[in-house]
Amino acid sequence: MLEKIAEVQKKLSKRIVEKEVRMVSKIAAVDVSYKGNKARVALVICSFPDCKVLKTKVLETEVSFPYIPTFFFLRETRPILLVTKGEEFDVLIVEGHGKAHPRKYGLASHIGLILGKPTIGVAKKLLRGTPENSYRKVGKAYVSVGNMITLKDAVRIIEKLLDGGYPKPLKLADKLSKGKISEDENTLPSDKTS
């Protein structure tokens, strides 16, 4: 079964578009945490480039697919689509790889293809077999194209959002998804790392 899914990933990777993103005023970031089969997904929308938090949203849902490296998109797509539904943003930052993936089609690419919006993949570690020209290291983050953005634009956006080596909206989404802060706490202290 996974072999067939891997083939589908390879085919879908050919549908990923890289293009310049010019007007960016709202950035969204999304992260998912788990307790057993329960997913807690957090969305943070902030202004760009000053990163003032405009909205936060947290949802919980059941997931049925287990964590399998390089097939992360099968586990996280549904929670991310639920939390982003009806929300407005120019670019979405996903905690997970985009083209920095052995089959050039990670979670950020899958979400970008479904939403039809520019997406950036951001991760703390590389996957084994990742093509070298598919990412850039920015601070502590491995940044890659999800969909509808160039690597140059993705890097430029992430550089402006860095806080302690990682994009501030993604750090906030991580803390929200893990319940370390509540939705009412819509700021993240600067110079603190998670």
Swiss-Prot record:
Reaction catalysis annotation: Endonucleolytic cleavage at apurinic or apyrimidinic sites to products with a 5'-phosphate
Please give the GO cellular component terms listed in this UniProt entry. Answer: cytoplasm
Q: What EC numbers are recorded for this enzyme?
A: 3.1.21.7
Q: Which GO terms describe its molecular function?
A: deoxyribonuclease V activity; magnesium ion binding; RNA endonuclease activity, producing 5'-phosphomonoesters; single-stranded RNA binding
Enumerate the residues marked as the site Interaction with target DNA. 67
Primary location class? cytoplasm
What's this protein's function? DNA repair enzyme involved in the repair of deaminated bases. Selectively cleaves double-stranded DNA at the second phosphodiester bond 3' to a deoxyinosine leaving behind the intact lesion on the nicked DNA.
The family classification in the record reads: Belongs to the endonuclease V family.
- The name on file for this protein is Endonuclease V
Organism, as annotated: Pyrococcus abyssi (strain GE5 / Orsay)
What gene is behind this protein?
nfi
